[in-house]
A protein has these predicted regions:
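Domain-level signature for soluble enzymes in the chorismate/prephenate branch of the shikimate pathway
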Residues: 1-177
């Protein structure tokens, strides 16, 4: 039996999808899996999520592929799934399986030669989420928080190539790289 799996096209999403495939194949060797890579609306913009529609931007095209029978299942990072799985009028989908939880912590990546204790008032630290922003400002209210979007590779490249001192990312993302 062939299972078509809708996934975002980013390397991290593909890694997660391959984890799902390994789990499926461990249950029954008779399954063949095909990854259907989809560019989500959330991947196509650099604007902050709160300005453009929130987390649903990452899942809507994947769910459309399910409703059009172009895919049999979709793999999402749970942080990208809105609390309502489908807008009114769409097919309703269910979460039927989850991989074991990865490391839940955040990490700070710093420019080469910068140590955490070197961060001072005005240090520019990039992050994408309001929780991380609040935590950084609790450490030092004079940090300059820079909004950042993009997949993990894009964010790391921005840290290296732009005027940033640090970047906050999920440890799980770093583990999967």
């Amino acid at each position: 039996m062939k299972i078509r799996i809708a996934s975002r096209a980013s390397p991290l999403a593909i890694f997660q999808t391959k984890e799902v495939i390994r789990s499926i194949e461990s249950l029954n060797e008779g399954h063949e899996c095909e990854i259907i890579k989809i560019e989500s609306d959330g991947d196509l913009t650099d604007k902050p999520l709160f300005e453009i529609g929130g987390k649903g931007l990452f899942v809507s095209k994947l769910e459309k592929s399910l409703s059009k029978n172009e895919a049999d299942i979709a793999v999402h990072s749970l942080k990208d799934v809105p609390t309502e799985l489908a807008p009114p009028g769409w097919h309703k989908f269910e979460i039927v399986a989850m991989l074991p939880r990865e490391d839940f912590r955040d990490v700070i990546l710093l420019k080469e030669s910068i140590k955490f204790h070197d961060l001072k008032d005005g240090s520019k630290i990039a992050t994408s989420g309001p929780r991380r922003k609040a935590q950084l400002l609790a450490i030092n209210p004079k940090f300059e928080i820079i909004p950042i979007r993009g997949n993990i590779e894009t964010r790391i490249n921005k840290l290296i190539n732009e005027d940033l001192d640090g970047l906050i990312v999920a440890k799980a993302a770093m583990n999967r790289l």
